[in-house]
Curated annotation (Swiss-Prot):
The keyword Cytoplasm applies. It comes from the Eukaryota. It holds the Pfam family IFT20. It comes from Xenopus laevis (African clawed frog). This is Intraflagellar transport protein 20 homolog B. GO terms for biological process: cell differentiation; cilium assembly; protein localization to cilium; regulation of platelet-derived growth factor receptor-alpha signaling pathway; spermatogenesis. It is found in: Golgi apparatus, cis-Golgi network; Cytoplasm, Cytoskeleton, Microtubule organizing center, Centrosome, Centriole; Cell projection, Cilium; Golgi apparatus.
């Protein structure tokens, strides 16, 4: 009966028979909630550590990927420049071949002309020798 009147006044006895303002059930629920919150905070902290580690790993992989990408772009550009150099060199060689062909044709014409002059000179010498 005394407990009921105290309960109505908002005072309660706990399991150790100490006078409390909170209802023992509410106090126990509060304690349980506090424990659950502590566990939740610990789990969140662990989760943040795991996520932080994953973010660092992903950042490292992104950096490595970017480095490899730059290397690949550099290699591709080098291959393109080598191909352009070869093409330019090929064009130079074609131009040199054309120039040499023209020079060869000039030499043939000059040779034919010199052969004709030589033949005329031999003919002139032969006629000169016959007239003597």
């Amino acid at each position: 009966m005394a407990r009921d009147s105290l309960s109505e006044a908002g005072l309660h006895f706990d399991e150790l028979n100490k006078l409390r303002i909170l209802d023992p059930d509410v106090s126990q629920q509060t304690t349980e909630l506090k424990e659950e919150c502590r566990d939740f905070v610990d789990k969140i902290g662990h989760f943040q550590k795991v996520v932080g580690g994953l973010i660092e790993l992903v950042d490292e992989l992104a950096k490595e990927t970017e480095n490899e990408k730059m290397k690949a772009i550099g290699a591709r550009n080098l291959l393109k420049s080598i191909a352009k150099q070869r093409e330019a060199q090929q064009q130079q060689l074609y131009a040199l071949i054309a120039e040499k062909k023209m020079q060869l044709e000039r030499y043939r014409i000059e040779y034919d002309a010199l052969c004709k002059v030589e033949a005329e000179q031999h003919e002139f010498i032969d006629q000169f020798n016959l007239q003597k």
